Amino acid sequence: MNISNKTRYGLRSVVYLGINYEKENISIKEISDKEGISKRYLEQIFAELKKGGIINSTKGTKGGYFLTTKPSEITVSGIIKLLEGNLNVIQEIDDYNIEDLEYTIVNKVWNKMSQALIDAVDSITIEDIINDYNSLSRNMFYI
C-alpha cells in the first residue's frame, strides 16, 4: 500500500493546525510556506478535510483554518480513510470462490495485514504526533 502525497500533506497540515489549536486561525499560505506544499494543492486537500468535518474556516482579516475538535480526538486513521478511502493492503476481491487458494491467502495474509495497519493508525492521535514532535524539538542541540 502506498500512501499518496495528498494524504501525507493532509496529515502534516492537520498536525500543523493541531500545534496551533489554541492559537489563531491559520492561513493556507502560512502552511504552504512552512511546509513547502503548493498552495493550490493544499486548497484541494483542505476542501476534502472540511467536507469530512476535520477542519473548518472563517473568513476575514483574522480568518483561516482550524481543527473542529481537539487534536486528542482526531486519529491518523480518520484522516487516511477520509483522503485515501480505505486502508486495505490490496483491492477487495468480490468474485473469488471460497475453495480457491486466493480466498485462503486473502483471509490468512492480506486481511490480517490490513487489520494490523488499521489497529496501528487507529491508536495514534494528532496529539500523539504533536507530543513526539515537541519532545524531539526540545532535545535538539544547536552549535
Q: Which residues fall in each region the model found?
A:
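Conserved segment of winged-helix/HTH DNA-binding domains
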Residues: 71-95
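A short alpha-helical element within helix-turn-helix/winged-helix DNA-binding domains
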Residues: 30-35
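Short amphipathic alpha-helical interface segments
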Residues: 10-22
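Basic amphipathic alpha-helical segments that dock to polyanions
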Residues: 45-50
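Beta-hairpin "wing" of winged helix-turn-helix
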Residues: 54-62, 66-67
